[in-house]
């Protein structure tokens, strides 16, 4: 299959083992996603471990540039969420509307 673009499966993980979290995003990436490109060369996989809102912004900026280059992205976020929003590694919270606005450009 000769494609001019790539499919990208990207995991953003913001979990903290000090709080008893299992690094499920890490396990998913290492045990499943990293194997995909050998079978499907048109698929690339990436993993971002983010510890703060600033790191989340940096990761989504990189992902936005991937989308701007024409690749198709599937984004998977491993973090805890609640009524207020998503809790990051450092216990900061990004509200649902803030998260929506942050990742919306990736989906347009």
Identify the meaning behind each predicted range.
Residues 103:
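Structured alpha-helical
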Residues 1-80, 86-97, 108:
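A domain-level signal for caspase-like cysteine endopeptidase catalytic cores
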């Amino acid at each position: 299959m000769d494609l001019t673009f790539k499919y990208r499966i990207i995991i953003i993980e913001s979990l903290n083992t000090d709080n008893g979290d299992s690094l499920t995003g890490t396990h998913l990436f290492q045990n499943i996603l990293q194997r995909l490109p050998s079978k499907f060369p048109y698929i690339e996989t990436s993993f971002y471990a983010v510890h703060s809102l600033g790191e989340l912004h940096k990761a989504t900026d990189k992902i936005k540039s991937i989308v701007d280059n024409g690749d198709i992205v599937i984004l998977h976020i491993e973090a805890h969420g609640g009524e207020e929003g998503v809790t990051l590694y450092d216990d900061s919270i990004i509200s649902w509307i803030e998260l929506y606005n942050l990742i919306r450009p990736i989906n347009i």
